Amino acid sequence: MPLVAAACCALALAAPASSAVLPGFPEDARRHAAAPAERERFLVPLRGRWESGFGLRWGRLHSGVDISVVSNARVRAAASGTVIATGWLRNHWGYGLVVKIRHRPGLVTMYAHLSAAAVRRGERVERGERIATAGCTGSCTGTHLHFEVHTRGRAVDPWPYLRGKLR
């Protein structure tokens, strides 16, 4: 099974931005891809090792990317915005401690499995500002950041949004 996950990650990395959704996903998922102008504003939330990409994993959608890091790594806001949630999400306990930021109407990022949040709901944050500490809360197998991007309420592949390298 690890080979399948690695193949999914390689496919997601190699795919052009217009086809970042893995084959087999509903066509309407492609309609929610990011516009190039939106992608330019994002920073990689932290440096670490790419562990798992967006797409099918074990028969289910893995709706973000996982970045493995050392304990207590600082997590930065990918873009400026307003914190709309911190804490454990009802009905999504597997994410553990999360921070969600709205960057503009219809564009939200989520940072999960955190050990501590450095921001509060309603707080304005700037691109690159420290918002949390990476951890292993919820369902996880080691310290990492699970990072998601949502456009118009749907998870989309975060890879096209990220600037810089994850490794």
Q: Each predicted region: which residue ranges?
A:
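Bacterial N-terminal signal peptides
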Residues: V4-A12
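Surface-exposed, glycine-biased beta-strand/turn segments
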Residues: A17-L97, R127, V156-W159, K165
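A residue-level detector for short acidic-glycine micro-motifs
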Residues: S52, V69, A85, H113-A116, ...
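Zn2+-dependent peptidoglycan hydrolase active-site motif and core
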Residues: H62, A78-A118, T143-E148
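Short, conserved secondary-structure segments in the cores of folded domains
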Residues: S63, S71-R74, S115, R121, ...
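A generic structural motif
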Residues: V70-N72, G106, L114, E129
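Conserved, short, structured surface segments that act as functional micro-motifs
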Residues: Y95-H103, M110, E123-R167
